[in-house]
Amino acid sequence: MVATDSSDQVAKFDVSHKIIEDIVYSLSNRIFSYAEHVPLNRYLTQWNNSGRRNGFSNNVELFNLEARSGASAFLLGSYTAAISSPGVYSMMTPSSCLSLLNPLLSNIIPFYGASKPLVVHVAALAYLEQTYCADNVSVLDFSYANNFTVFASQSNVEAAHLALASTLAAKAAPVIHVYEPDAIVTTTDPSLPLLDSNAVVECFNSYQSEADPVSNASKALKHVNDYFNTSYAPAEYYGSQTASKVIVTFGKSETVAARALLAANPDVGVLSIRIFPFVAENIFNVLPTTCKSLVVLSQVRSTAVGTSSIYYSFLLATLLSTKPSALAISEHRYSLVESVTLSSLFDALHETLQLKAATPKAVHVDKSINVWESDVGDSLVLSLVSAYRTDKSRSVAFRPLFDNLTLAGVRFTVAQVSTANAVLTDVVKDVDADITILTTDRLPLHYRVLAKAAEHSICLLQSSIAPDEATKKLPYEFIADALEKGVKLVLIDPKKFAIDASNLPLLVSFIQLVKPGLGVDEALAVLAKQNNLTDTNLKDAVDSLKQSLSFINLDASALKDREPSEKELPSTAKETSFAPNAVKTLDEDITPQSSNWQTVAKQIIFPEAYKKKDALRPDVSEKVFTVHVRANKRLTPAEYNRNIFHIEFDLGDSGLTYDIGEALGVYGVNNKTHVHDFIEEYGLDANELIHVPSIQHPGHWETRTVFQALCQNIDIFGKPTKKFHEQLLEFETDEKERADLQILISPAGAPDFKRRAEVDMLTYADVLKEFKHAKLTAAQIAQIVPVIKRREYSISSSQKKHNDSVHLLVVVVGWKDGMGRDRYGQCSHYLSNLKVGEPLCVAVKTSVMKLPTSPLKPIVMAGLGTGLAPFRAFLQFKEWQRMQGIESGDILLYLGSRTQREEYLYGEDWEAYHSANLLTHIGQAFSRDQPYKIYIQDVMRSTKDMLKKALMDEGGSFYLCGPTWPLPEITSVLEEVIQSSYDEPVDARKIIEQWKEERRFVIEVY
């Protein structure tokens, strides 16, 4: 939805939600985002990662958290902590999560202070019946139950001012700022203007709050009006001053739909509530004196349609207590899953209010375009609206909608272009399309794509259907809608176009429609730069375009002897997601294919035609970095049977950054000698090319040599699965081998299968060589052998101390298999053999291993073997804090290994930190250094008083990293520590569960 272009003449598209996030970031010291499945923090995360400071020149702490029961405990704990720094606390969440946050968030009132305003920015959004819908009822119910004041934005352009006003009001009491979800996905050009950060801060600093939250909310709104020359009010009236009937609305959808009725109904007005709870005086001040009746629109839950809403009941009580008999007040309830539109509102109220039908007015809209396409790859919309980008007198807004449940992912976009010298800040609803664009003829089989087409509009359909077959093969509903509305149908066959897999003929046709009189070559020139076309490409495109286009003449005979579909088709896509479908179910099985060097040569010579992309690891979704080995040192003696080593990587100019507690994902490489041996034994060509469909870059293919694929991608030396044996059976041509394979995958062969896997430890390579008559090509091997999985290792350094390197602590996993062969863990062995200066691919993985917010809180660390790695990073960070003059609480370290002589990992570091009084206590458990075994839990049990002081008396945090086996015993010790703090028996397990919720009990075991 956001696109940029290096050209000075090309505008930038931005999501409307940016203006909300900008206010939040400018005013907040701490931001808690509970929006993992909804894009409410896109810009917040970008700005925070870039080191942007807020408007007060302070660093911003951004916490992206899971939305689950008890999730608000982290915010509550941070807010109520004695050492919590002053400043605005902001939360981002969809309204559907409020019920999960409610139990704990309601406890914040007793601790509330003006120095720490709390404002909750809520996208009124719920997911019901497999679609997203506007959800204001959750916000209003939450507000009423917890005494939170609510500010409602009624358009995208208002959102910045209302976000600011709600933050001002939060100086007196916690506040919710609610906005409807169009802001999340509506993209505009030019960008909605961001408020000046200095002005925002000045406005905030100059505001003096009142004690009463309701009157304070009105005052905050007036303060914003005075500062920015706006005219927002707690309740706003639209319509005639002589209206006798008024519709009361809350939120954007209700207000927009109700206001659309006014043109045809002068006796009707609209009263939009902006602040809840409300004051009767604010309502009566704006209502016409002629008003005799109010109809309150009330959104309710589907299970409560028969019951008045809390919102309506509160409004009724407020108004009647002031003027008991002045008005007739009624309620129109509608459920969460019902969308409020002009037509639905007219149907519901036309008898009650004696309404006349109203025609939606496309205010400031010159062209409305509906685009239906697969959600694979980039959207066509940016290319389509490029025709307007150089026209400074017009603006563009578009709103994509993703239906992940149809055709493995459909993107439906409404794009609108403004009239001259007008600015669109949102997509205007209920406007029929002047142009409908379909990228495949499969879409009309699932939707009535022309249901929202305007009379005598145009439909561009990309399809390889023969023109004379179009009326027979296209669905009944599509033809019927086209005939009813007089839609002109143009078929565009991409196969007849000069450039393969190109949407250019469709785009050129569109450009000519919106720029009448423009020639084909001129239309192509508009798109040439955007599509990297050369002069040769342009000439070929012009010559072939006429062959690609067919104008279809439709008449009533096209429906003769045809019947409508048994299933009623929807007229729009269901919004089931805010992003393309990440999991594709393809109708045809696209598999790896053998390729040749001639094809690759064409891709290199003509990159613009093939849309060639170069990527470090195109097969993975994570951001990948290239680092180089700086040091690789074995920590255990050479004669010792365990190789544990410390390895350092030089970050160079890779741009890799990491936090303490995070892990480094390493993309291991198979042993090249073993790969060469397998290629030779199996009879493959190392230089043959394999063409693989890209998962991460849909619509693209990845090309590698066989040698590259077997080294970097295919887990050829991994443990073969039963599914692999079943797939291998399909290629088997020898009867005996086929029979052996069938027995092996049957229940009777289970013991033998287990022996081969766990004793003989056969690999995919072993099995392929064993069943030599099931001869596979390299492409077929790539199809049935899984990819090498990334291995992750806890980072043992802090970037505060080592700004240009990252360190790992790794043990080489080694054993002998049933055939006496030396075997090793693929990635640990790869790392151990790396030489200084060698490159490798890595990615950073976030972790739960985070230090307490307060540096004064004690921490207790328990690590076994290589599980000590993150605690070295912790101490390096604490060392850096001390250098900044930041004091630390007590730090206790418990470590477990086999022997002190061979496995005192990072021992010199621990001793140095202990001598420097940074590390308070070292508890050492070397299990094999004495006749009897001593384990880490034994050492912890011997220092229970120390643990009680750190964890119970001072509220410290406990961390465990290492193998899973000691977890029950260590937990038992902690339960004893908890019980020792009470005179009567307590449920220690429940307290540990509470610690987990508060992130004071963190484990990372493997």
Swiss-Prot record:
Pathway participation: Sulfur metabolism; hydrogen sulfide biosynthesis; hydrogen sulfide from sulfite (NADPH route): step 1/1
Stored InterPro entries: CysJ-like_FAD-binding, FAD-bd_FR_type, Flavoprot_Pyr_Nucl_cyt_Rdtase, FNR_nucleotide-bd, NADPH_Cyt_P450_Rdtase_alpha, OxRdtase_FAD/NAD-bd, Pyrv_flavodox_OxRed_cen, Riboflavin_synthase-like_b-brl
One GO molecular-function entry: flavin adenine dinucleotide binding
Cofactor (UniProt): FAD; FMN
Pfam families the record matches: FAD_binding_1 (PF00667), NAD_binding_1 (PF00175)
Positions contributing to FAD binding: 658-669, 788-798
GO cellular component labels: cytosol; sulfite reductase complex (NADPH)
Transmembrane segments: none
Cofactor stoichiometry and binding remark: Binds 1 FAD per subunit.
Gene Ontology BP terms: hydrogen sulfide biosynthetic process; sulfate assimilation
Keywords: Electron transport, FAD, Flavoprotein, FMN, NADP, Oxidoreductase, Transport
Reactions catalysed: hydrogen sulfide + 3 NADP(+) + 3 H2O = sulfite + 3 NADPH + 4 H(+)
Domain of life, per lineage: Eukaryota
Residue span(s) of domain FAD-binding FR-type: 622-852
Disulfide bond sites: none
EC identifiers of the protein: 1.8.1.2
Protein's job: This enzyme catalyzes the 6-electron reduction of sulfite to sulfide. This is one of several activities required for the biosynthesis of L-cysteine from sulfate.
Name this protein carries in UniProt: Probable sulfite reductase [NADPH] flavoprotein component
Native source species: Schizosaccharomyces pombe (strain 972 / ATCC 24843)
